Amino acid sequence: VDRRQRQMCIRDSQLTELLTEFGQIDELFMDYTYAEGENGKNSKDWDAEGIVKLARKLQPQIIINNRLGLTENRQDWDYITPEQFMPQQWPTVNSQRVPWETCQTFSGSWGYHRDEYSWKSVHQLIVMLAETVSKGGNLLLNVGPTARGVFDERAIERLNGLAHWMRFHSSAIYGCTAAPTEYACPNNCILTYNPNTNRLYIHVLEWPFKSLYLKQYKGKIKYAQLLNDNSELKFRTETKKGSHMTENTGADDVIITLPVERPNVELPVIELILE
């Protein structure tokens, strides 16, 4: 038996152990080397097709990422994994939208690094989460433990910040995806949409003064409220006659009346219950 065959046997035995000794495994995240360069390895070097076949045999429901170099056959992977950047829009393959998950870190390092200072703020992380969902994606967020096996205090602070925001805003994330194209995104906002409840969520990045303009929303909104406290927001579609204190609206536009003071949360969210 040559060296490569021994490697394949070891690999298959380890993969079999992982996929048979720990109950149902939902996801297999492969992270093999690149094919380019003098020491590059391609999908044939790793027998990537064999990995996929074995994984699907042992765990038929499993989903596998696209890092095995098998780009020709869509059956060989289930989702793509852009790392450390945010796609400009829902990623496509052959002009078709595909499932995707962005791989991100709390700081600039995947593992614990004592002297790493480029940590993302709680606000940045929440905006990243909302933007990912608004483009139909999932967010993988890495936390590297210390040599003591605990999380850095900076990571704990940010995890608590995410948890606090999610306590009242999870409905704008879980079960949500990109909004239908008929709903235009207001300025300085992000839209997420739950197709099961038919609710649209407006994540307001910059809090406007008193009014939020929604173009072409007339007849589409049943009720509006802030998610952080479930307080109702009034909205109107017509300009009050004989007043210098109200904005003009387009024929099919809606204006939501906002409190002057921004809600005291990292990212305010308006929930629209649609008609």
Provide a role label for each language-model segment.
Residues 96, 100-101, 107-168, 175-190:
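Aromatic/acidic polysaccharide-binding cleft in carbohydrate-active enzymes
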Residues 28, 136, 202, 270:
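Conserved, mostly hydrophobic/aromatic
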Residues 216-232:
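Solvent-exposed beta-hairpin/edge-strand motifs
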Residues 191, 230-254:
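Extracellular/luminal ectodomains and secreted, surface-exposed scaffolds of diverse proteins
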Residues 1-10:
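Single conserved hydrophobic/aromatic residue that forms the stacking wall/gate
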Residues 17-59, 63-105, 149-158, 186-191:
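Substrate-binding cleft/loops of secretory-pathway carbohydrate-active enzymes
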